[in-house]
Protein backbone atom coordinates (compact mmCIF):
# COMPACT_ATOMS: atom_id res chain seq x y z
CA UNK A 1 0.00 0.00 0.00
CA UNK A 2 1.53 3.30 -1.06
CA UNK A 3 0.72 6.42 0.92
CA UNK A 4 0.09 9.53 -1.08
CA UNK A 5 1.86 12.70 -0.06
CA UNK A 6 -0.29 15.77 0.57
CA UNK A 7 -0.14 18.37 -2.15
CA UNK A 8 2.16 21.31 -1.49
CA UNK A 9 0.53 24.66 -0.93
CA UNK A 10 1.87 27.10 -3.52
CA UNK A 11 3.62 30.25 -2.34
CA UNK A 12 1.21 32.81 -3.67
CA UNK A 13 3.49 35.74 -2.83
CA UNK A 14 6.14 34.32 -5.13
CA UNK A 15 3.70 33.15 -7.80
CA UNK A 16 1.75 36.35 -8.10
CA UNK A 17 2.43 39.96 -7.43
CA UNK A 18 0.04 41.94 -5.25
CA UNK A 19 -1.86 43.14 -8.27
CA UNK A 20 -1.90 39.78 -10.11
CA UNK A 21 -3.17 37.52 -7.32
CA UNK A 22 -6.56 36.10 -8.48
CA UNK A 23 -9.63 37.03 -6.52
CA UNK A 24 -10.26 33.38 -5.56
CA UNK A 25 -6.84 33.14 -3.96
CA UNK A 26 -6.71 36.57 -2.29
CA UNK A 27 -7.26 35.07 1.18
CA UNK A 28 -4.27 32.73 0.85
CA UNK A 29 -2.10 35.55 -0.49
CA UNK A 30 -3.05 37.79 2.42
CA UNK A 31 -2.32 35.03 4.97
CA UNK A 32 1.16 34.39 3.58
CA UNK A 33 1.85 38.11 3.32
CA UNK A 34 0.90 38.58 6.97
CA UNK A 35 3.25 35.80 8.01
CA UNK A 36 6.08 37.34 6.04
CA UNK A 37 5.43 40.73 7.58
CA UNK A 38 5.47 39.27 11.10
CA UNK A 39 8.72 37.41 10.34
CA UNK A 40 10.32 40.61 9.05
CA UNK A 41 9.22 42.54 12.14
CA UNK A 42 10.61 39.84 14.43
CA UNK A 43 13.92 39.94 12.60
CA UNK A 44 14.05 43.72 12.83
CA UNK A 45 13.28 43.57 16.54
CA UNK A 46 16.04 40.99 17.07
CA UNK A 47 18.57 43.15 15.24
CA UNK A 48 17.41 46.22 17.13
CA UNK A 49 17.64 44.37 20.44
CA UNK A 50 21.12 43.09 19.61
CA UNK A 51 22.40 46.53 18.63
CA UNK A 52 20.81 48.24 21.61
CA UNK A 53 22.30 45.74 24.06
CA UNK A 54 25.77 46.94 23.11
CA UNK A 55 24.83 50.43 24.30
CA UNK A 56 23.01 49.25 27.41
CA UNK A 57 25.72 50.25 29.86
CA UNK A 58 27.87 52.79 28.01
CA UNK A 59 27.37 56.07 26.20
CA UNK A 60 24.41 58.42 25.93
CA UNK A 61 21.93 55.61 25.12
CA UNK A 62 22.75 53.62 28.24
CA UNK A 63 20.09 52.88 30.82
CA UNK A 64 20.70 52.40 34.51
CA UNK A 65 20.11 48.85 35.66
CA UNK A 66 19.27 50.17 39.11
CA UNK A 67 16.42 52.40 37.93
CA UNK A 68 13.89 49.74 36.98
CA UNK A 69 11.01 52.16 36.41
CA UNK A 70 13.02 54.77 34.41
CA UNK A 71 11.05 57.54 36.10
CA UNK A 72 13.75 60.17 35.75
CA UNK A 73 16.20 60.92 32.93
CA UNK A 74 19.63 59.32 33.13
CA UNK A 75 21.93 62.29 33.63
CA UNK A 76 25.40 60.69 33.60
CA UNK A 77 25.55 60.32 29.83
CA UNK A 78 28.87 58.54 29.44
CA UNK A 79 30.69 61.71 28.38
CA UNK A 80 32.82 61.92 31.53
CA UNK A 81 35.74 59.64 32.43
CA UNK A 82 34.64 56.73 34.58
CA UNK A 83 30.91 57.38 34.02
CA UNK A 84 29.04 54.06 33.81
CA UNK A 85 25.61 55.30 34.80
CA UNK A 86 25.64 54.14 38.42
CA UNK A 87 23.94 56.94 40.34
CA UNK A 88 21.35 55.38 42.61
CA UNK A 89 21.37 58.40 44.94
CA UNK A 90 20.71 60.86 42.12
CA UNK A 91 23.79 62.94 42.91
CA UNK A 92 24.02 64.07 39.30
CA UNK A 93 20.47 65.45 39.13
CA UNK A 94 21.67 69.03 39.44
CA UNK A 95 24.37 69.87 36.85
CA UNK A 96 26.14 72.38 39.10
CA UNK A 97 26.22 69.97 42.03
CA UNK A 98 27.43 67.19 39.75
CA UNK A 99 30.22 69.43 38.47
CA UNK A 100 31.32 70.11 42.04
CA UNK A 101 31.15 66.45 43.06
CA UNK A 102 33.12 65.43 39.98
CA UNK A 103 35.87 67.90 40.87
CA UNK A 104 35.96 66.71 44.48
CA UNK A 105 36.11 63.07 43.43
CA UNK A 106 39.01 63.64 41.05
CA UNK A 107 41.04 65.66 43.58
CA UNK A 108 40.44 63.08 46.31
CA UNK A 109 41.28 60.28 43.87
CA UNK A 110 44.65 61.87 43.17
CA UNK A 111 45.25 62.32 46.90
CA UNK A 112 44.28 58.68 47.39
CA UNK A 113 46.80 57.55 44.78
CA UNK A 114 49.61 59.49 46.44
CA UNK A 115 48.44 58.54 49.93
CA UNK A 116 48.29 54.80 49.22
CA UNK A 117 51.76 54.94 47.71
CA UNK A 118 53.09 56.86 50.71
CA UNK A 119 51.54 54.40 53.16
CA UNK A 120 53.30 51.34 51.75
CA UNK A 121 56.60 52.70 50.38
CA UNK A 122 58.43 53.32 53.71
CA UNK A 123 57.55 49.82 54.90
CA UNK A 124 58.78 48.30 51.64
CA UNK A 125 62.05 50.24 51.78
CA UNK A 126 62.60 49.27 55.41
CA UNK A 127 62.01 45.58 54.64
CA UNK A 128 63.73 45.26 51.28
CA UNK A 129 66.55 47.82 51.45
CA UNK A 130 67.03 47.87 55.21
CA UNK A 131 66.64 51.64 55.53
CA UNK A 132 66.44 52.52 59.21
CA UNK A 133 63.17 54.38 59.47
CA UNK A 134 62.34 53.09 62.91
CA UNK A 135 58.68 53.54 63.83
CA UNK A 136 58.38 56.17 61.09
CA UNK A 137 58.13 53.33 58.56
CA UNK A 138 54.55 52.77 59.76
CA UNK A 139 52.43 55.45 58.15
CA UNK A 140 50.29 56.28 61.21
CA UNK A 141 53.38 56.49 63.44
CA UNK A 142 55.41 58.73 61.14
CA UNK A 143 53.98 61.99 62.46
CA UNK A 144 54.85 61.13 66.05
CA UNK A 145 58.49 60.68 65.03
CA UNK A 146 58.80 64.48 64.87
CA UNK A 147 58.77 64.56 68.68
CA UNK A 148 61.63 62.07 68.99
CA UNK A 149 65.26 63.06 69.45
CA UNK A 150 66.57 64.16 66.07
CA UNK A 151 63.09 64.63 64.63
CA UNK A 152 61.64 62.82 61.64
CA UNK A 153 64.50 60.93 60.02
CA UNK A 154 64.20 61.08 56.24
CA UNK A 155 65.55 57.89 54.60
CA UNK A 156 67.85 57.34 57.57
CA UNK A 157 70.21 59.99 56.21
CA UNK A 158 71.62 62.30 58.93
CA UNK A 159 72.77 64.89 56.37
CA UNK A 160 69.19 65.79 55.44
CA UNK A 161 67.20 68.46 57.24
CA UNK A 162 64.85 66.56 59.54
CA UNK A 163 61.46 67.85 60.62
CA UNK A 164 61.58 68.63 64.33
CA UNK A 165 58.76 71.15 64.73
CA UNK A 166 55.21 70.11 63.95
CA UNK A 167 53.96 73.69 63.64
CA UNK A 168 56.64 74.58 61.08
CA UNK A 169 55.98 71.34 59.19
CA UNK A 170 52.25 72.06 59.05
CA UNK A 171 52.84 75.66 57.93
CA UNK A 172 55.15 74.60 55.09
CA UNK A 173 52.64 72.00 53.94
CA UNK A 174 49.77 74.50 53.93
CA UNK A 175 51.81 77.04 51.94
CA UNK A 176 52.97 74.52 49.34
CA UNK A 177 49.54 72.97 48.85
CA UNK A 178 47.91 76.40 48.79
CA UNK A 179 50.21 77.57 45.99
CA UNK A 180 49.52 74.49 43.89
CA UNK A 181 45.77 74.61 44.48
CA UNK A 182 45.65 78.33 43.76
CA UNK A 183 47.48 77.75 40.49
CA UNK A 184 44.96 75.08 39.51
CA UNK A 185 41.75 76.88 40.51
CA UNK A 186 42.75 80.21 38.94
CA UNK A 187 43.64 78.61 35.62
CA UNK A 188 47.36 79.29 35.80
CA UNK A 189 49.61 81.87 37.41
CA UNK A 190 48.06 84.76 35.48
CA UNK A 191 44.54 83.47 34.90
CA UNK A 192 45.43 81.85 31.58
CA UNK A 193 42.15 79.92 31.49
CA UNK A 194 43.61 76.46 32.00
CA UNK A 195 41.29 73.56 32.75
CA UNK A 196 41.04 73.39 36.57
CA UNK A 197 40.84 69.59 36.47
CA UNK A 198 43.42 68.94 33.77
CA UNK A 199 45.58 72.08 33.63
CA UNK A 200 48.48 70.44 31.81
CA UNK A 201 51.60 72.55 31.16
CA UNK A 202 53.63 72.47 34.40
CA UNK A 203 51.44 69.62 35.66
CA UNK A 204 52.26 67.51 32.60
CA UNK A 205 56.04 67.74 32.16
CA UNK A 206 56.15 64.41 30.29
CA UNK A 207 53.59 65.50 27.70
CA UNK A 208 51.27 62.56 28.38
CA UNK A 209 48.23 64.56 27.23
CA UNK A 210 49.63 65.60 23.87
CA UNK A 211 47.75 62.87 22.00
CA UNK A 212 43.94 63.27 22.41
CA UNK A 213 43.19 59.53 22.28
CA UNK A 214 45.89 58.70 24.80
CA UNK A 215 44.71 61.57 27.01
CA UNK A 216 41.11 60.29 26.99
CA UNK A 217 42.30 56.80 27.94
CA UNK A 218 44.51 58.13 30.74
CA UNK A 219 41.57 60.08 32.19
CA UNK A 220 39.60 56.86 32.60
CA UNK A 221 42.58 55.01 34.06
CA UNK A 222 43.23 57.83 36.50
CA UNK A 223 39.73 57.98 37.94
CA UNK A 224 39.32 54.18 38.09
CA UNK A 225 42.65 53.66 39.86
CA UNK A 226 41.92 56.69 42.05
CA UNK A 227 38.66 55.14 43.23
CA UNK A 228 40.49 51.93 44.08
CA UNK A 229 43.15 53.95 45.92
CA UNK A 230 40.53 55.72 48.04
CA UNK A 231 39.10 52.35 49.10
CA UNK A 232 42.64 51.09 49.75
CA UNK A 233 43.35 54.04 52.05
CA UNK A 234 40.10 53.34 53.89
CA UNK A 235 41.22 49.74 54.31
CA UNK A 236 44.60 50.87 55.65
CA UNK A 237 42.82 53.06 58.21
CA UNK A 238 40.64 50.17 59.38
CA UNK A 239 43.66 47.85 59.56
CA UNK A 240 45.56 50.38 61.68
CA UNK A 241 42.67 50.66 64.13
CA UNK A 242 42.06 46.92 64.38
CA UNK A 243 45.58 45.46 64.24
CA UNK A 244 47.86 48.39 65.09
CA UNK A 245 50.11 47.41 62.17
CA UNK A 246 51.00 48.81 58.77
CA UNK A 247 49.63 47.39 55.49
CA UNK A 248 52.82 45.53 54.53
CA UNK A 249 53.13 43.88 57.94
CA UNK A 250 49.46 42.90 57.80
CA UNK A 251 49.98 41.39 54.35
CA UNK A 252 53.05 39.46 55.53
CA UNK A 253 51.16 38.09 58.54
CA UNK A 254 48.23 37.04 56.36
CA UNK A 255 50.44 35.22 53.85
CA UNK A 256 52.26 33.44 56.69
CA UNK A 257 49.05 32.26 58.38
CA UNK A 258 45.86 33.03 56.40
CA UNK A 259 43.63 31.13 58.82
CA UNK A 260 44.60 33.26 61.81
CA UNK A 261 45.21 36.61 60.14
CA UNK A 262 42.16 37.65 58.16
CA UNK A 263 39.27 40.07 58.45
CA UNK A 264 36.84 37.49 59.83
CA UNK A 265 39.24 36.35 62.55
CA UNK A 266 39.77 39.92 63.73
CA UNK A 267 36.05 40.72 63.53
CA UNK A 268 35.21 37.87 65.91
CA UNK A 269 37.42 39.48 68.55
CA UNK A 270 34.98 42.40 68.75
CA UNK A 271 31.84 40.30 69.10
CA UNK A 272 30.15 40.09 72.53
CA UNK A 273 31.20 37.04 74.52
UniProtKB/Swiss-Prot annotation:
Ligand binding (chlorophyll a 4): 225
Name of the protein described by the UniProt record: Chlorophyll a-b binding protein of LHCII type I, chloroplastic
One Pfam family cited in the UniProt record for this chain: Chloroa_b-bind
Residues binding chlorophyll a 3: 155, 222
Coarse class of the protein's main subcellular location: plastid
Chain sites annotated for binding chlorophyll b 2: 110, 161
Subunit structure: The LHC complex consists of chlorophyll a-b binding proteins.
Mod. after translation: Photoregulated by reversible phosphorylation of its threonine residues.
